[in-house]
Amino acid sequence: NEREKDSYVNQDIVPERTSLNVHFKVPSAGYQEMFSQMEADGVISTRGIKADAFRYGELVFDVNSAYFYNHGGYDFAKQFYTDAYKSAIKIVGGEQYILSAVMHADERNRAMSEALGEDVYHYHLHVVYIPVVEKEIRWTKRCKDKSLVGKVKETIMQVSMSKKWASKP
């Protein structure tokens, strides 16, 4: 999503427009490195996660190209996706769980461009995040102070692709 390659399979990407892509959150490193750092810092926990479990999620906010074309193009799309990014922060539980967020402004809508006889671009927002759920860790029967058994010991943000993240129509 960061457009760091020299060429792409998608022939509708216009490299000269890549500078118009809007980064709401630029990754500070590779996703795996960022994940490991967040785990080391205690921001997230992988306690109980299976080795083959998904560790990343992606939200894609995508609206018909005609909508932006009819409402002001690039500037309108920037404002629209600024608001969408604010929604993404709420959806994932906080900006600290977002690794990357970029609005692509460099993809040409071929069909619409040909129909109108001018370049029309397809604006959309990619948000890569770490899916987490709040989990309460409780004192167990092995605790020396029996009055604590069953009470919340700590609350962690556990990496999880639980039903919370299931796609809904």
What is each residue range found by the language model?
Residues 1-169:
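N-terminal nicking endonuclease/strand-transfer module with a His-rich metal-binding environment
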